[in-house]
């Protein structure tokens, strides 16, 4: 019984990895059909549906992985780092680094891969970015309490600016077919971004 559950979980992971790899390849710039995905995994479409009731559920699982990865790591940053600007830098690096390491998932983050899918999926990505923006805003608001001085500009505006910076570099990464990595020149870019915040 345990072996059967483990095999099912492994097949589910194999399907999700294949979908992420297809999103990373040139196939990712087009609608990915279950027929193409099944052929890529080496199973029938019926076998796909034994593991996932729909392609939407496959995307849901990938989005859940993205959410868990980013939110868990942001929480670790907040636990380990107490100063505001290093926190913001680490969160920014995390988002850009995650995108760079997971090009197929970056197509989901930018909404590119979801153009052909249910609107609800784009709503989940929107909610994820809203959660991250809320975390960034909270980090900025805590600055006055932790360090004795706040920001000169409204934290909501600054949080939006920082997230737009991340989204812009991720979009460029996708648009360039993953040639322009979002973390390249980060050490030179961050002081420019930080200067806008302070």
UniProtKB/Swiss-Prot annotation:
Q: Which residues form a coiled coil?
A: 119-144
GO biological process: one example: negative regulation of division septum assembly
Any one GO CC term of this protein is: bacterial nucleoid
Q: What does the UniProt function comment say about this protein?
A: Required for nucleoid occlusion (NO) phenomenon, which prevents Z-ring formation and cell division over the nucleoid. Acts as a DNA-associated cell division inhibitor that binds simultaneously chromosomal DNA and FtsZ, and disrupts the assembly of FtsZ polymers. SlmA-DNA-binding sequences (SBS) are dispersed on non-Ter regions of the chromosome, preventing FtsZ polymerization at these regions.
Q: Which domain of life is it from?
A: Bacteria
List UniProt keywords, sorted A-Z.
Cell cycle, Cell division, Coiled coil, Cytoplasm, DNA-binding
Assigned protein family: Belongs to the nucleoid occlusion factor SlmA family.
Tell me the DNA-binding residue spans.
33-52
Q: What is its main location?
A: cytoplasm
Q: How does it assemble?
A: Homodimer. Interacts with FtsZ.
Listed GO MF terms: DNA-binding transcription factor activity; transcription cis-regulatory region binding
Q: What is this protein called in UniProt?
A: Nucleoid occlusion factor SlmA
Q: Which residues form the HTH tetR-type domain?
A: 9-70
DNA repair is among the record's keywords:
no
**HAMAP family attached to this UniProt entry:** NO_factor_SlmA
Q: Which InterPro entries match?
A: DNA-bd_HTH_TetR-type_CS, Homeodomain-like_sf, HTH-type_TetR-like_transc_reg, HTH_TetR, NO_SlmA, SlmA-like_C
Subcellular location field: Cytoplasm, Nucleoid
* Pfam families noted in UniProt: SlmA-like_C, TetR_N
